C-alpha cells in the first residue's frame, strides 16, 4: 500500500481553502451580464471559449493533492446545481466560496465547527422558505423570454426563440438544440407524433418532389409482429379498399411476399399503402406502439393478447388526419384518439418518470410524453465559426434548462437581489447558542456574494452598490448591464426560483462538510515515499 500524507486542523483547512479559491476565482469571472469569457485549452483542435460556470469548473485539476481536494468539492457544488436546475452553477460556486471563507475564519477564531454547520443549515432552510414566498409564477411567454435571455448571458434572440418554442409545443413539449447550417438561429416545429423510422420501400413515395409519402385521412394498422405472409393481411386490405382510404402499416417488420404485394397494389392504384417499422426495440417498442394506438384511437394487434391479424377489422385500425413518411422519419398529425385516453396514457408515463432510476430511461419517457402531449421543437443554433457555435449552443442549453425551471417553480428578482432580500428578512433569526448564531450570520453574509460579484465583474464598487440595494425594498436592485437602479422585474431581470434555491442548498451542503473537516489524507508522491533500509544478513 502506498505511503500517505496526512494533514490536520488548520494546515489542512488552509490548503483546502486555497484550492477552493483557485476554482471559484476561475468560475466567478463569468457571472452576470458583464461576466468575462474563460478560454479552455484542448489537447487537440481549437480551444473552447465559454461563459458557463460548470464547464470551467470541470476543467480544473490542481497539482497539489490537498488543494485539489478543496477544488473538487466545490466542483461538486457546480455539477449538482447543474444536474438539478441546469443553471446557476456560477452562483452556487460563489455562494460556496463565501460560506467556506467566512466559516473557516470563524473556526480559526475558536468556534465549534459542528455548531457553525447547524447554524448555516438553519439559515438555509429558512431562506428556502422565504424564496418560495417571494416566488411568482412564470406563465406568460414574455416572462419566459426574459428568463431565457438572462440565462443566455443577455442574448435576447435566444430568449425569444425559447419562448416561441414553448408557445408552439407547450410547456411539456420536447425542445432540442442542434447545430444550424447558417448564421441565423432557426426554430423548427414538428407538430403531432414523430418517430425515427422511414418507409420500407421507396416505391411507396407519392410526392417525388419531396421524396416523401403523404397520405390524407389514412387508416393505421398497428401490429406487434413481423408480417411476411400476405394472406394474413387480405381481410384488412379488402376492407380498407372498400372504404376508399389509404392505409399505413406500422409493424415490427414487413418483408418478402407481403411487402412485394403491398408495393404492387400501390403502384397499380388499387389501394394506397405505406409500411414502416415500429419505433424502438423490445419492451420500449411495445410501449411506443401502445402510445400510437392511444393517439390514433386504434388497437395494437398482438398475439400476446390473443389477437390475430386475419381477424382484424376496421374497428381495430387507428386513424389520423394526415401521415407524412420520408426516408428517416414518420409523422402522424392529428390522431383521432380520445383526449381522455391520451391524458390517461400521459399520466401513466409520468408516474413511470417519477420511478425511473436511470437518466436515459427518464429522457426516453419524457420524449414519449412530449410526443403524446404536444410536439417537438428543434432550435438550430447559427454561428460563423465552430468555436462560436459550441459556445452559443452551451448558452442556449443553459437558457432552456432555466426556463423549464422557471415554469416549474416560478421566478424571483434576478441580479442577486432575491438573496439579499431573504438575508434582510432573516436578520433576526437566532439559534440555540452563540456559535450557531455565528453560523447563521456566515450564511446570511454569503447571500450577498452573488450581487457583489456581478457588480465587481461590471467594474463598479461592490460595497456601494450592495448598500444601495439593501436600502431599497422588494424588487429594487441594480441592473449591471445598463448600470442603473430600479425594479428588477420591470427590467426583465428574473431568476428561476429553482435555480436560486438549488444553488444555495448545494453550496451550503458542501461548505458545511468542508468547515467540519479536521483531517485530510492523500497519497504521497512516489519520490517522497520513505526508502526502506537495505535488508541485513541473517545472523
Curated annotation (Swiss-Prot):
Q: Which GO terms describe its molecular function?
A: ATP binding; ATP-dependent protein folding chaperone; isomerase activity
Q: Which CDD domains match?
A: GroEL
Top EC class, one word? isomerase
Q: Which reaction does it catalyse?
A: ATP + H2O + a folded polypeptide = ADP + phosphate + an unfolded polypeptide
SUPFAM superfamilies (UniProt xref):
GroEL apical domain-like, GroEL equatorial domain-like, GroEL-intermediate domain like
Superkingdom: Bacteria
Q: Which InterPro entries match?
A: Chaperonin_Cpn60_CS, Cpn60/GroEL, Cpn60/GroEL/TCP-1, GroEL-like_apical_dom_sf, GROEL-like_equatorial_sf, TCP-1-like_intermed_sf
Alphabetic keyword roster: ATP-binding, Chaperone, Cytoplasm, Isomerase, Nucleotide-binding
UniProt-listed Pfam families: Cpn60_TCP1 (PF00118)
Q: Which cysteines are joined by disulfide bonds?
A: none
Self-association state and partner proteins as the record states: Forms a cylinder of 14 subunits composed of two heptameric rings stacked back-to-back. Interacts with the co-chaperonin GroES.
Any idea what this protein is called?
A: Chaperonin GroEL
Q: Which organism is it from?
A: Enterobacter asburiae
**Organism taxonomic ancestry:** Bacteria, Pseudomonadati, Pseudomonadota, Gammaproteobacteria, Enterobacterales
Amino acid at each position: 500500500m502506498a505511503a500517505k500524507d496526512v494533514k490536520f486542523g488548520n494546515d489542512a483547512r488552509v490548503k483546502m481553502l486555497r484550492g477552493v479559491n483557485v476554482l471559484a476565482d476561475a468560475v466567478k469571472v463569468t457571472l452576470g451580464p458583464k461576466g468575462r469569457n474563460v478560454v479552455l485549452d484542448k489537447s487537440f483542435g481549437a480551444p473552447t471559449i465559454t461563459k458557463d460556470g460548470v464547464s470551467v469548473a470541470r476543467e480544473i485539476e490542481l497539482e497539489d493533492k490537498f488543494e485539489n481536494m478543496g477544488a473538487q468539492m466545490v466542483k461538486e457544488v457546480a455539477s449538482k446545481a447543474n444536474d438539478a436546475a441546469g443553471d446557476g452553477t456560477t452562483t452556487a460556486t460563489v455562494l460556496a466560496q463565501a460560506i467556506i471563507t467566512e466559516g473557516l475564519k470563524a473556526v480559526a477564531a475558536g468556534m465549534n465547527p459542528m455548531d457553525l454547520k447547524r447554524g448555516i443549515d438553519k439559515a438555509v432552510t429558512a431562506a428556502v422558505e422565504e424564496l418560495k414566498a417571494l416566488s411568482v409564477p412564470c406563465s406568460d411567454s414574455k416572462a419566459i423570454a426574459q428568463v431565457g435571455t438572462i440565462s443566455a448571458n443577455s442574448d435576447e434572440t435566444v430568449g425569444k426563440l425559447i419562448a416561441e418554442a414553448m408557445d408552439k409545443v407547450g410547456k411539456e413539449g420536447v425542445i432540442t438544440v442542434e447545430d444550424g447550417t447558417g448564421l441565423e438561429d432557426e426554430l423548427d416545429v414538428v407538430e403531432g407524433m414523430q418517430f425515427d423510422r422511414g418507409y420500407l420501400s421507396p416505391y411507396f413515395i407519392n410526392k417525388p418532389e419531396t421524396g416523401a409519402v403523404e397520405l390524407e385521412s389514412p387508416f393505421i394498422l398497428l401490429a406487434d409482429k413481423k408480417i411476411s405472409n400476405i394472406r394474413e393481411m387480405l381481410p384488412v386490405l379488402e376492407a380498407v379498399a372498400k372504404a376508399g382510404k389509404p392505409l399505413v402499416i406500422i409493424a415490427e417488420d414487413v418483408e418478402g411476399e407481403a411487402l412485394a404485394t403491398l408495393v404492387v397494389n400501390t403502384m397499380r392504384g388499387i389501394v394506397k399503402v405505406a409500411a414502416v417499422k415500429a419505433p424502438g426495440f423490445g419492451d420500449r417498442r411495445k410501449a411506443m406502439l401502445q402510445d400510437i394506438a392511444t393517439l390514433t384511437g386504434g388497437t395494437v394487434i398482438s398475439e400476446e393478447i390473443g389477437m390475430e391479424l386475419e381477424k382484424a377489422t376496421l374497428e381495430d385500425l387507428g386513424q389520423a388526419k394526415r401521415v407524412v413518411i420520408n426516408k428517416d422519419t414518420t409523422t402522424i398529425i392529428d390522431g383521432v384518439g380520445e383526449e381522455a385516453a391520451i391524458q390517461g396514457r400521459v399520466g401513466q408515463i409520468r408516474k413511470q418518470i417519477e420511478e425511473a432510476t436511470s437518466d436515459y430511461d427518464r429522457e426516453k419517457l419524457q420524449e414519449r410524453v412530449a410526443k403524446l402531449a404536444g410536439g417537438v421543437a428543434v432550435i438550430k443554433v447559427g454561428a460563423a465559426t465552430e468555436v462560436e457555435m459550441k459556445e452559443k449552443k452551451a448558452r442556449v442549453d443553459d437558457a432552456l434548462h432555466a426556463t423549464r425551471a422557471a415554469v416549474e417553480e416560478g421566478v424571483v428578482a434576478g441580479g442577486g437581489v432575491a438573496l439579499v432580500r431573504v438575508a434582510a428578512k432573516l436578520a433576526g433569526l437566532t439559534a440555540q447558542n452563540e456559535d450557531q448564531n455565528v453560523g447563521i450570520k456566515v450564511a446570511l453574509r454569503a447571500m450577498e456574494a452573488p450581487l457583489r460579484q456581478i457588480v465587481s465583474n461590471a467594474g463598479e464598487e461592490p460595497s456601494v452598490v450592495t448598500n444601495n440595494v439593501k436600502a431599497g425594498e422588494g424588487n429594487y436592485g441594480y441592473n449591471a448591464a445598463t448600470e442603473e437602479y430600479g425594479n428588477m422585474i420591470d427590467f426583465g431581470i428574473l431568476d428561476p426560483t429553482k435555480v436560486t434555491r438549488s444553488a444555495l442548498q448545494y453550496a451550503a451542503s458542501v461548505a458545511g462538510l468542508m468547515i467540519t473537516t479536521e483531517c485530510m489524507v492523500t497519497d504521497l508522491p512516489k519520490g517522497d515515499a520513505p526508502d526502506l533500509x537495505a535488508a541485513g544478513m541473517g545472523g
